[in-house]
């Protein structure tokens, strides 16, 4: 059994109503529920955080190492293109992660084509709407199956 952390970056709390032609009509709660179901079916623990504040995401990443989180799925949203601090937090804790995006960032504005995370991620999933999260979670399962986490004993 592993522990997976899903981090949702800025403005993702508006899913379902914000630019639905780009991001779809599913809410963040809908996505989280699907992911929780998938994790429970596999016997894994799943934690979530959505924040519009960079420091909250960074603090949660730091806490993840202390808590023994085995894998992170992160949609850094707009921080993808701006946050060296968030990148440094992920690199600093050494927890493997997948970068995830609802839209295909490469088919959008040029400023969205650069990511501060993709070169240190296990992989990147983008362009499949809410299914991007499910695909990223499946990638986490596959990674964890190949790299079995050590069991914690209380």
UniProtKB/Swiss-Prot annotation:
Gene3D superfamilies for the chain: Dehydroquinase, class II (3.40.50.9100)
Catalytic activity from the UniProt record: 3-dehydroquinate = 3-dehydroshikimate + H2O
EC number(s) per entry: 4.2.1.10
An example Gene Ontology molecular-function term: 3-dehydroquinate dehydratase activity
PROSITE patterns the UniProt entry points to: DEHYDROQUINASE_II
Keyword terms of this UniProt record: Amino-acid biosynthesis, Aromatic amino acid biosynthesis, Lyase
Function: Catalyzes a trans-dehydration via an enolate intermediate.
Protein name per its UniProtKB record: 3-dehydroquinate dehydratase
């Amino acid at each position: 059994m592993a522990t997976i952390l899903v981090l949702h970056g800025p403005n993702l709390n508006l899913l379902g109503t914000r630019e639905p032609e780009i991001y779809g009509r599913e809410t963040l709660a809908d996505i989280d529920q699907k992911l929780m179901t998938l994790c429970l079916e596999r016997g894994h623990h799943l934690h979530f955080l959505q924040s519009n504040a960079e420091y909250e995401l960074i603090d949660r990443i730091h806490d993840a190492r202390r808590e023994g989180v085995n894998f992170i799925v992160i949609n850094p949203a707009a921080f993808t293109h701006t946050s060296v601090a968030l990148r440094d937090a992920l690199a600093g804790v050494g927890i493997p992660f997948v970068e995830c995006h609802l839209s295909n960032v490469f088919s959008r504005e040029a400023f969205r084509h650069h990511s501060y995370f993709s070169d240190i991620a296990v992989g990147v999933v983008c362009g499949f709407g809410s299914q991007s999260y499910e695909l990223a979670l499946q990638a986490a399962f596959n990674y964890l199956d190949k790299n079995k986490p050590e069991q914690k004993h209380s």
